[in-house]
Amino acid sequence: MKVQLEDTGVNLNNIDSIRDYRNDILTNVRKYFSDTMSTEILSPVETYTAKTTTYDGGAASTYALNHALNYNPDYADFNGFGGDCTNFVSQCLYEGGGLPMHYGTPYTKTCWYYTTSTNRSSSWTGAEELYDYIFSNSSKINANISNWNSVSFGDIIQLTSGGEGYHSLIVSGIQYSSYGKSDLLVCAHTADRRHVSLASYYPGSNKRYIDITSSDL
């Protein structure tokens, strides 16, 4: 007796007919899930892209002006322990400029953070270490080596000797004359300076200029 599913046309006595029907079902199921995944599941999902935090140099310079002579009690004072200059500049980048901390192993320069005086990265408090971190492969801070003409509010200036940084300053203002840009005004700790002339207070020193732009955190 010939047995047949009326709504499918499958001949249950014919193995080829059954196999063809099964293959048709599998094909339709795959197509259904493929269409569903692409339209209902995959389309709302965004591919991961690194978050970028834009550096606010103006706010960093405002923080510098507010705390150059008035130390923030949330941070240890490293005067007498190698100096507080880079601790202060790091505060400006974070508290004022809005750059997120990059946590990691304490006392290393593969990260950039401060929790306590004994739980911090060396790049938070050391001039050369901060420079090394910023321009390392592990850095989350985006910056460029710049020059006197190009740096602006919130950028870093480091005094160097033998090619290594030993003192960090932050730009808090720019002076102009009738001929154009004439001087940079800076803030610093150790020694504490607020909005002073770079040319007058640090004449003849070798300097490097760091233009901070953003963070990838």
Describe every region a protein language model picked out:
Residues 74-123:
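Extended boundary segments
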Residues 86-95, 168-172, 186-188:
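Active-site scaffold segments
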Residues 101-105, 171, 198:
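Short, solvent-exposed loop/turn and secondary-structure capping segments
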Residues 1-71, 76-95, 150-152:
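Active-site-adjacent structural elements in enzyme catalytic domains
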Residues 68-69, 93-98, 158, 162, ...:
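Hydrophobic/aromatic-lined pockets within catalytic cores
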Residues 112-184:
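...with weaker cross-activation on analogous glycine-rich loops/strands in unrelated enzymes
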